[in-house]
Amino acid sequence: MKGWVNNVKKNRFEIDMCNGSIMDKLISFSLPLMVSGILQLAFNAVDIIVVGRFSGSQALAAVGSTTALINVFTNLFIGISLGANVLAARFYAAGKDREMSETVHTSITLALISGIMMAVIGVLLAKWALEIMGTPDDVIGQSALYMRIYFMGMPFFMLYNYGAAILRAIGDTKRPLIFLIISGIANAALNMILVILFHMGVAGVAIGTIISQLISCVLVLTCLYRSEGSYQLRFSKLKINGAYMEQIFQVGVPAGIQSTVINLSNALLQSSVNSFGSIAMAGYTAANNILGFLYMSVNSITQACMSFTSQNYGVGKLKRMDKVLRDCAILSISIAAVLGGLAYSFGPLILTVYTSDPKVINCGMEILAYTSITYFLCGIMDLFPGALRGMGYSAVPMVLSVIGTVGTRIVWVFGIFPNHRSLSVLFVSYPVSWIITIVLQVVCFYFVRKRVHQKEKRLL
């Protein structure tokens, strides 16, 4: 089985993660993923820029105030797609075609069901959730309208993400990038038409997003349908296999819970920002969008770490897994340090793209001062859970992330912030929580790695 990956014939989109140089393959895998993430945010930024410029600061605040909530609702199911990625990568590397096919069809079925569930939940609970967050009266109507329309496209969003996770499992990050470019251009064009030409405001932005998600969904499903080999999709075979769903959930549910709970802490911070009014909300929206570019950059390395670790774990190459983590750490720190420094240095100029209001720009810079420069810490923090998930260990990293990240921010918001009310004090919680979580994750990784190596020695 360990030799199977040496003999498998790769198509031009796939990457052999188990043999040869690691760094250049990490870059080949991560770069399209990074560009995909950045382009996705760029197209989302077009949404924000267009609505801010042509529909006003209240519309900008309305769209921005939904971000944390949308992430809370969706990230549990997106996290489960990581379980599909890990399981598919392991079966693909080991040459288990039947198991790979079952994983693909179970994953796509789960995506469809979860997408429909999210659409119903989002439409029904949008305004209630916004009220719980203390969204100001002057923007809550537009915020609720945006969320309800946005959630109607959840089935397309989920199907694309799960389909792309399958492609990443085989080392293909290029085709999802192509699909994203096509759908993103369509989204930008629809924004121009619906918001600028037809003056539809936040509704126009949401409708454009749904249509673009439909396009990317159709493209990724068509790609899987036309593929050859174990990851080929056949709609007649769509069903849930309980055994494979359980394995997907073992990795994916803890990852999803972690992401959801962390976004709940971000929603808590959003509520604190809301208490400063619509100017601070708009500044946070713009700054958070910039931070999103940094996150997508380091997250591409985390995704690479997870996929490479999973494939090498599947064929028993444990020493290579250590080298994967080392090279990923070098890449993540370097990228985050450079991009974070640039984001802060050119922050005032970048923020003017989102708004011309100097008060909003000042709020955005106040937030970036404590988050962009220290963002390399976030990259390090996510790498260790990524490696652990690649080995099938997901629950403990989830608990530690919740304790380190969410616990710290809750203590900060309720214990420190009320006595020192400022955006600066509020967002110092980011680097503090990252450092605490890194310490916890490194200790966890050390013990799990030791256990895995001891287990391998007993099998030899």
Please annotate each region the language model reported.
Residues 55-68, 147, 206, 278-293, ...:
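Small-residue hotspots at the loop-to-helix junctions and early N-terminal turns
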Residues 42-61, 130-137, 193-200, 260-293, ...:
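Helix-terminus/linker motif at the lipid-water interface of multi-pass membrane proteins
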Residues 28-47, 149, 183, 212-216, ...:
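Transmembrane helical elements of multi-pass membrane transporters/channels
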